[in-house]
Amino acid sequence: MTIGLVGRKVGMTRIFTEDGVSIPVTVIEVEANRVTQVKSVETDGYNAIQVTTGAKKASRVTKPEAGHFAKAGVEAGRGLWEFRLNNGETFTVGSELKVDLLADVKMVDVTGTSKGKGFAGTVKRHNFRTQDMTHGNSLSHRAPGSIGQNQTPGRVFKGKKMAGHMGAERVTTQNLELVRVDAERNLLLIKGAVPGATNGNVIVKPAVKA
């Protein structure tokens, strides 16, 4: 199964097993994912479904978005996401995907947008070691050091780890244990931390490496 669910990261807490072991979990709230479009090989070149979730103020919905949602006959949501379909999987526009979709899943992959850290140096961004605090070093404690050679090759190689913008990028954490599916409250409890800030959108899919 390649499809998943779009949810909202609520925060972290812990639950206890029957023998008293504490398990740290991230709580993901999954409101019903409404299917807004079904794509096919004939019309789009590939099979997929497009979903939305949550709600959006009417004043914040653009005219193209309003027309798209009206055509599907669903309430405007806070965004649009897409999941590829395997051969044989069928969905209809307007149908809803809920947490029970993952009821039989043990391990999941969670995708989100990592917390933005702004401009960061190499020590924070790439885990470089710091240089000596003493022994004649007075200015280069957190400097990256050499970034290459001299006239040959006369340039800095692509991919060189340097200071720059850190965070605020799409990140996937794989093989997290899905501890509990609370269908009554539309919650997923996932062991450990997941990418992103509180209230951020996350995509939960069955693990590809499980």
UniProtKB/Swiss-Prot annotation:
Region (Disordered): 134-153
GO cellular component terms, semicolon-separated: cytosolic large ribosomal subunit
Gene3D superfamilies from the UniProt entry: 3.30.160.810, Translation factors
PROSITE patterns assigned: RIBOSOMAL_L3
Keyword RNA-binding: yes
Any GO MF annotation of the entry: structural constituent of ribosome
InterPro entries found in the cross-reference section: Ribosomal_uL3 (IPR000597), Ribosomal_uL3_bac/org-type (IPR019927), Ribosomal_uL3_CS (IPR019926), Transl_B-barrel_sf (IPR009000)
Domain of life, source organism: Bacteria
N5-methylglutamine modification, residue list: 151
UniProt keyword list: Methylation, Ribonucleoprotein, Ribosomal protein, RNA-binding, rRNA-binding
Listed GO biological process terms: translation
Keyword Chaperone attached: no
Post-translational modification summary for this protein: Methylated by PrmB.
Family statement drawn from the similarity comment of this UniProt entry: Belongs to the universal ribosomal protein uL3 family.
Subunit structure and binding partners: Part of the 50S ribosomal subunit. Forms a cluster with proteins L14 and L19.
Its biological purpose: One of the primary rRNA binding proteins, it binds directly near the 3'-end of the 23S rRNA, where it nucleates assembly of the 50S subunit.
NCBIfam families attached to this UniProt entry: L3_bact
Protein name per UniProt: Large ribosomal subunit protein uL3
Organism: Aeromonas salmonicida (strain A449)
